[in-house]
Amino acid sequence: MSIADKLKTIAENEQKVFEAGKKSEYDRFWDNYQDKGNRTDYGSGFGSCWTSDIFKPKYDIVPISAYMMFNNSKMAIDLVEHLEKLGVALDFSKATSTQYMFQSSSFTRVGIIDVRASTNSRPLDSTFANCMKLITIDKIYLKTGAVGEFNATFTNCVALENVTFEGSITKNGLNVQWSTKLTKASIISIVNALSNTTSGLTVTLSKTAVNTAFETSTGANNGSTSTEWTTLIGTKSNWTISLA
């Protein structure tokens, strides 16, 4: 074997040793941080110090406490896509505490938010407040009949376009007036989720979003007076649907 070949072999072996060392450190860190997949308390678990290069969990994340879990995260990524590439699931179906979960974070997309197991009277309290880069929430499963007020849930969600609700909205406080880019499908989902059995309650939407989504022709910007819109909100006459 020539000297050049020997040097090449040494370099290749060094790289293999280096990669093995990195894998060992990765395993050691995440085995400890996630308790080998048994961790359930993720309160404030992934805050402002985490980057997408570091946030590469080894195990599925199934929190019981998700309080402030991603609060103030600076990761401006599609969270769903990021975790799918890692083969890791994020499952909130057992979470009993979800307040402030994504507050002031920089994610562009989050997946399924399930608050049906919540034991808090306000499970969506400030959950997405000040998420100014958030475009898509795949779905929010509501705890029908037990969800408290939507206190500041979507405050300053100025980029939000897509959100789907599953369940019934039975309390005051849902306000998405900052979300001027909401799609027609998202607005319809909100209206359809409004309880048919409550009365005297108010929901606030963006007039700009409604005007654009329900406009009668491109550029007309008249959706809030369109027949389609008035017919839709007519199905929820027990609610005050305010446009701001």
Stretches with model-predicted labels:
Residues 18-244:
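Negatively charged
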Residues 1-28:
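Short, low-complexity N-terminal tether/leader segments at secretion or assembly junctions of large
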